[in-house]
Amino acid sequence: MATVISDPDVKRTTDTKGSVVVPGDTSDSNKSSDDTETQRSTHLGSTDDHVFADPATAEYWRLKYEKAGYENRHRFDPELTWTAEEEKKLVRKVDKRIMVWAWVMFCALDLHRRNINRAISDNMLGELGMNTNDFNYGQTIFLVSFLSAELPSGLVSKKLGADVWIPFIMCGWSIVAGSQAFLSNRAGFFAIKALLGLLMGGFIPDIVLWLTYFYKSNELPLRLAWFWTALSTVNIVGSLIAAGVLQMRGVAGWGGWRWLFLLEGIVTLGIGILSWGLMPPGPTQTKNWFRGKNGWFTDREEFIMVNRLLRDDPSKGDMNNRQAVGPARLWLALKDWEQWPLYLVGLTTYIPPSPPSTYLSFILRQIGFSVFEANLLAIPSQFLFAVNLLIISWVSERIKERAIISSLANIWIFPWLVALVTLPATASPWVRYALLTGLLSYPYCHAILVGWNARNSNSVRTRAVSAALYNMTVQSGNIVASNIYREDDKPLYKRGNKILLAICCFNVLLLYGVKAFYIWRNKKRDKQWNAMSREEREYYILNTTDEGMKRLDFRFAH
């Protein structure tokens, strides 16, 4: 009988005597990566042909997990078997316990990232003596602070544990965000934006890394798509809340925008406090005073959870979840240049829709809609945004295609921007609103790219750093985006939209180029791998010091 003893994304088998047998033809790099990934990851229930079926390989990884102090190593069992029904039931349980609360926490983050867009529809800028450019400066300060905190926050989280660090920063940003109710001038606005950026910066990469502790590689992208529906959910719910709360203008002598900041800060502070009890460190660490003395999972469920994750990706056990990424390992992760193309994609891909999204309510106010109407009219685009996000993420995972599917986001945006640039100033406000709604209904590819980045990292060490670096490039792009619409270009922002058109075209070409790059890298590795003898491959598999994406038997997804 043959058994797979593969590291992620490459297929190797052993015969019954345990000698390594590697398929000789891996010239089709996409096939060698994704076909194997599909076989290994999408199958539910245990099989005989898993990575640890060979005793020598199982012992190699057992020693590696012991050396790393992997927190779940006591549940590692190469001989464990389970049924597909058991695994399906367990995944549903993880979704309810882990994914739902991760989504709620993300809503708490995005509520405070986006409520400023609704507050400015209630004359916030005028009451603070500010204009559009001042608002842009504040957004830039927030994003620079957000970006600066990404990597340090990720490193602190890796040392303390996401279950400790994330609730702490959530409580912190809720208090600071609520204090915006007491703003009186531009300087205070800038100071609070800086503090918010520093506190919020590490949340997304930290929570994505935390989710990888519970899900297999093929399960993550679609769940991240559901995770990012928080963006549209918050925009819809936030618009409804704002439509009501902003009517409180005059209560206690306050503007409606002040009440908006205060009340939403109180709500998210409650979510932050609950997160101390609802975030377990990992699959086998759910027992505590809040979650119960028996925890959320039975012993058998813990065994299944740990072994299904490790058989999907053995590298998930090469670090403890309380182990810091030291300077040497950080430098190694930073030097993983083959990950850099994805960072460039993160830098530019989301720029085109960002200014129209940020300024939607403000633009609608400028072209004649009321505060109430401007907030409610944001809802249709957000609903369509969520639908398209789920569709594009599902299609990408279904056909195992990332780059081309991701390019559809900018292809979608392009014609709407062309229409906005060419539309005469005398056109009906409803026509302009319809074009903006169409643009902002684009298929958001962020879940695909985050999953792609995590998959190509191929180790916990690299994944912890690359998640932060990727999100840092995204925030860098947001800094650029926040300064494209300028005071002298309002209310139609035609000059800004022309700039967005050029970036749109660049993004499509970039994604095709990144796909070509990874195909080239895979073919180069195929050539090296196929030039090795069977004995050389066996020795390499069990003795190499190469880690993560540097392994010759690893193939990049694209």
Question: What are these model-derived regions, one by one?
Answer:
Residues R97-T132, S148, S153, G238-A242, ...:
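Extracytoplasmic
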